[in-house]
C-alpha cells in the first residue's frame, strides 16, 4: 500500500471585492482542490454562498474547480491572498421582489396584448413597466450592488446578473437612446415636409416711444453767427514742459535727469575708453604723432563743448511789429477789389532779406568740405556731451 501523503497546512486570506465583509482567514491543506475550497467557504463564509456562485481569483487568474492548490500556491509563502467574487442572494428579500415583478409583468401583458400583437414590443414594454412600478423601498434596495443584481435577475432571462454596467449607467444609456430616436424622428418628419413647429410664445408687438419735441434755442452759443474775420486765438500753456525734443518716430522726447547728470559709472566708462585709446595710440605710433593727435583731440573736444566756436551763429532779427488790427465787419469780397502790390507782381523783384539768404546758400568750397570731414571724424571719437537746456 502506498503511504498516505502528509497534510501540508496553508493559511488562506479571503477578501471581498466590495469590502462588505471583513477579510476571512482560514486554514486549509495544499492537497485540496478549488472545488473543495469553495464547498468549505459555503459553510464558513458569512453569506453562505453556493459553490457554483463563487469565483476565486489568485494573482489575477481565475481558479477552476478541478485545479489543485498544490499546483497553484507557491511553497515559499505560508500565507496566500484569494479574492472571492460571488452572486449573493438574500432569501428574505427575494420573495418581495419576485412578487412585485410577477404583479408588474401580468398587468402590462394583459393590457397591451390587443394593442401590440408583436412579442418583441410587448417584452420591451413589460421590462420598462417593471422598472417603473418598483416602489421606493425597491429603489433603495436596488441602490446597493447585491440588490441591483437581484432585480436584474428577477426581470427575465434577457438581463445578466453579472452586468459590467451600473444602474446609473444603464439609465444614462436609455436616455441617450431615447434622445437619438427622437432626433431621427424629427429628421424624418422634416425631410418629408410634414414637420409642424411647436407653438412658440405669443409675440408681443413692441411699440416705440415717441421722440420728445426739440427744445427751442437749446444751444444759443451754436446758433449765433461766427465772426469770420476774427484772429485765431493762440492758447499758451504756461505749465508745459519746455525741455522737449522732437522724436523721429513720432511724439516728443522728455529730457531725463540721467542724460544731464552722469554718475560715476558713466565717467569711469568714459575714462576707461579714453585710456585704451591713448595706450593704443602711444604704443603703436611715435611721440610726435601722439602729441599731434592729442592736441587735435583736445581742440575738437573744446569746440564740441562750445568753448571755441569757429563761426558765430547768425542772429535773426525779427521785426517787432504788432499784430495787425482786426477789421470788424469786413466784407470778404473786398479782397478781390483791392489793388495788388506791384512789387509782389514782379517776379524779378526780391526783398533784400531773400537776397542775403540766396547768397548764403552758395556751394561750399573744398577747404570747408575737408574741414567738415576732419571735424566729423574726430567728433565721433569723443563722447557726446549733455544736451543744452532750452531757456
From Swiss-Prot:
Subcellular location: Endoplasmic reticulum membrane
Tissue specificity note: Widely expressed; in the brain, expression seems to be restricted to neurons and vascular smooth muscle cells. Present in activated microglia in senile plaques in the brain of patients with Alzheimer disease.
CDD domains: Ubl_HERP1
Cytoplasmic face residues: 1-263, 311-391
Domain Ubiquitin-like: 10-72
Location of Phosphoserine modifications: 135
UniProt membrane topology term: Multi-pass membrane protein
Statement: the UniProt record of this protein carries the keyword Membrane: yes
Acetylation listed as a keyword: yes
Residue segments, region Disordered: 100-126, 318-359
Stretches in topological domain Lumenal: 285-289
Gene Ontology terms for molecular function: transmembrane transporter binding; ubiquitin-like ligase-substrate adaptor activity
Modified residues (N-acetylmethionine): 1
Region of interest (Interaction with UBQLN1), residue spans: 115-200
Polar residues: compositionally biased ranges: 112-124
Note: Although the precise topology is not known, experimental data suggest that both the N- and C-termini face the cytosol.
PANTHER family for this protein: HOMOCYSTEINE-RESPONSIVE ENDOPLASMIC RETICULUM-RESIDENT UBIQUITIN-LIKE DOMAIN MEMBER 1 PROTEIN (PTHR12943:SF7), HOMOCYSTEINE-RESPONSIVE ENDOPLASMIC RETICULUM-RESIDENT UNIQUITIN-LIKE DOMAIN HERPUD PROTEIN FAMILY MEMBER (PTHR12943)
Protein name as annotated: Homocysteine-responsive endoplasmic reticulum-resident ubiquitin-like domain member 1 protein
Organism placement in taxonomy: Eukaryota, Metazoa, Chordata, Craniata, Vertebrata
